[in-house]
Amino acid sequence: MLTEEEFLKKFGENIREFREERSMTIDELSIITGIRAQYLKRIELGTAKRLSVDHVFIFADAFNLKPHEIVKGL
């Protein structure tokens, strides 16, 4: 089982991977999701402390994925 720190780091890596696969910038993802670019950077770095299930659904919608695909490997 992952620690909270490991979970946040892996979640952030997944988000960065999905964003880069789509050649999106942080600013573009910010516009699509309504999440501030600065906070998106912290999510990708694994340093954001306030993630919720809502974030999974927001990112799934932004990347046109199913929610379980966002948390792959977690």
Residue ranges and their predicted role:
Residues 1-21:
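A short, Lys/Arg-rich alpha-helix, primarily the initiator
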Residues 13, 23-24, 51-54:
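Residue-level signal for the short linker/turn that defines the boundary of a DNA-recognition helix
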Residues 15, 29, 40-43, 70:
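Conserved hydrophobic/aromatic packing and binding residues within compact polymer-binding modules
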Residues 21-22, 32, 62:
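Residues within the alpha-helical elements of helix-turn-helix
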Residues 28-30, 59:
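Short alpha-helical "recognition helix" segments of helix-turn-helix
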Residues 35-50:
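Recognition helix of helix-turn-helix/homeodomain-like DNA-binding domains
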Residues 54-69:
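DNA major-groove recognition helix of helix-turn-helix/homeodomain DNA-binding modules
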